[in-house]
């Protein structure tokens, strides 16, 4: 599959979707994008910069939701202009799709909306690539139905069906807890879509701080290494210069100063995994 001019798939080096959770302003976005671009260029990692203009799914009605659609899109457009990076953001309802698609390179769907048929059809008919997140309540094999919905909508609109990514972001495991099942990453290959592992949201503790979500950022390197060892097309990781001051999801964000070292480890592991055939593809008795 071609994505933003580069090849993605289980047989390609992983690409990275990274940036702050919420868009916090133009200068911070440019600073983070610039540092990520420099780190990824040196390691040969294709990079898509991400930022959210609205955190619609919040633990509390009093927490920061972000800068809003108009301001957020202006910042993403400027980040793309100044850095040359492709940009990604989430859409939250059908009314936003056309406006967001006119600015960004890749759309993303929130995990909780993965079964909303009209919404999935709307993003699929935008003509843009779409990173479709698996719901925390969904079995990995059920993502095939979601991807099939998107492909059917694209087909109905006369558009390419080869534009969709299947993204794992953890599954609910009791109250205020998520776990990342590594077998899900392999199972989701059966969707026929490139599989992306959202590492940072997989260590989130939804609602774990009462009025906001907690997280275990120290487990991000652990899960990132595990996901790369399974074999994935892409990784999704949110980062921040000072996670304690982040507008949202600070507890599960990677401190920006550690991103390059983490990526160096992951690139080395990815090369080992992808220079050999995947045994699970021919593991019969």
UniProtKB/Swiss-Prot annotation:
The listed locations are:
Cytoplasm
Give me the reactions it catalyses.
Answer: D-arabinose 5-phosphate + phosphoenolpyruvate + H2O = 3-deoxy-alpha-D-manno-2-octulosonate-8-phosphate + phosphate
Name a Pfam family for this protein. Answer: DAHP_synth_1
Keywords of the record, alphabetical order, are: Cytoplasm, Lipopolysaccharide biosynthesis, Transferase
User: Biological process GO annotation list?
Assistant: keto-3-deoxy-D-manno-octulosonic acid biosynthetic process
Q: Which EC main class describes this enzyme?
A: transferase
Q: In which pathway does it act?
A: Carbohydrate biosynthesis; 3-deoxy-D-manno-octulosonate biosynthesis; 3-deoxy-D-manno-octulosonate from D-ribulose 5-phosphate: step 2/3; Bacterial outer membrane biogenesis; lipopolysaccharide biosynthesis
How far does the signal peptide extend, from start to end residue? none
EC number, UniProt record:
2.5.1.55
Its domain of life? Bacteria
Q: Which SUPFAM superfamilies match?
A: Aldolase
Task: Return one GO MF term.
Answer: 3-deoxy-8-phosphooctulonate synthase activity
Sorted alphabetically, the Gene Ontology cellular component annotations on this record are: cytoplasm
Family stated for the protein in its record: Belongs to the KdsA family.
Q: What name does UniProt use for this protein?
A: 2-dehydro-3-deoxyphosphooctonate aldolase
Q: What is the lineage of its organism?
A: Bacteria, Pseudomonadati, Pseudomonadota, Betaproteobacteria, Burkholderiales
Task: State which gene encodes it.
Answer: kdsA
């Amino acid at each position: 599959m071609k994505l933003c001019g580069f090849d993605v798939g289980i047989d390609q080096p992983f690409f990275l979707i990274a940036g702050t959770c919420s868009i916090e302003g133009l200068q911070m976005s440019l600073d983070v994008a610039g540092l990520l671009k420099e780190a990824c260029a040196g390691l040969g990692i294709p990079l898509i910069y991400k930022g959210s203009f609205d955190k619609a799914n919040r633990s509390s009605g009093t927490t920061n939701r972000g800068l809003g659609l108009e301001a957020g899109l202006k910042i993403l457009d400027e980040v793309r202009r100044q850095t040359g990076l492709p940009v990604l953001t989430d859409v939250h309802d059908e009314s936003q799709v056309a406006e967001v698609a006119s600015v960004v390179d890749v759309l993303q769907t929130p995990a909780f909306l993965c079964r909303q048929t009209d919404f999935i059809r709307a993003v699929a008919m935008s003509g843009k690539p779409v990173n479709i997140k698996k719901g925390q309540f969904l079995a990995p094999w059920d993502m095939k139905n979601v991807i099939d919905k998107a492909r059917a909508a694209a087909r109905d609109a006369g558009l390419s069906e080869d534009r969709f990514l299947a993204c794992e972001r953890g599954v609910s495991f009791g109250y205020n807890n998520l776990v990342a099942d590594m077998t899900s990453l392999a199972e989701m290959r059966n969707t026929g879509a490139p599989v992306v592992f959202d590492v940072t949201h997989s260590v989130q503790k939804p609602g774990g701080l009462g009025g906001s979500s907690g997280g275990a950022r120290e487990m991000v390197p652990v899960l990132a290494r595990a996901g790369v060892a399974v074999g994935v097309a892409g990784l999704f990781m949110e980062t921040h210069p000072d996670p304690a001051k982040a507008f949202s999801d600070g507890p599960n964000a990677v401190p920006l100063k550690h991103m390059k070292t983490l990526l160096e480890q992951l690139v080395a592991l990815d090369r080992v995994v992808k220079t050999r055939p995947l045994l699970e593809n021919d593991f019969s008795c």
